[in-house]
């Protein structure tokens, strides 16, 4: 059972992704690595995305099938509990490789039917 209306959590995920995209606009991996404020901001938004995914509960798979929800939820635990071993390149790869399909899936789920 989700904590709240699924559309609200989906919107939180979308907003988090869009903020991350704005944070890293014009950066490459090296620029990202050299900007600890941006790294911290991105990690914070990934935590919020993870939490919103957890709040979706089973609705996540129903609303956005085919996405790696276990991994999306798990990145929050990785950032919280292994904070001293977070690899900036892994965070960057998450931004580049994983956020675009997540964003597309969330947009499809939020689109009006028809």
Predicted regions and their residues:
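Solvent-exposed interaction patches of small proteins and small membrane subunits
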Residues: 1-114
């Amino acid at each position: 059972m989700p904590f709240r209306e699924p559309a609200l959590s989906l919107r939180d995920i979308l907003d988090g992704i869009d903020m991350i995209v704005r944070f890293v606009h014009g950066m490459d991996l090296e620029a990202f690595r050299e900007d600890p404020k941006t790294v911290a901001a991105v990690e914070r938004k990934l935590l919020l995305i993870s939490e919103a995914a957890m709040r979706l509960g089973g609705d996540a798979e129903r609303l956005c099938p085919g996405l790696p929800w276990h991994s999306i939820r798990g990145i929050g635990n990785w950032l919280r509990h292994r904070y001293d071993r977070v690899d900036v390149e892994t965070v960057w790869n998450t931004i580049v490789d994983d956020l675009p399909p997540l964003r597309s899936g969330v947009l499809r789920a939020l689109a009006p039917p028809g």
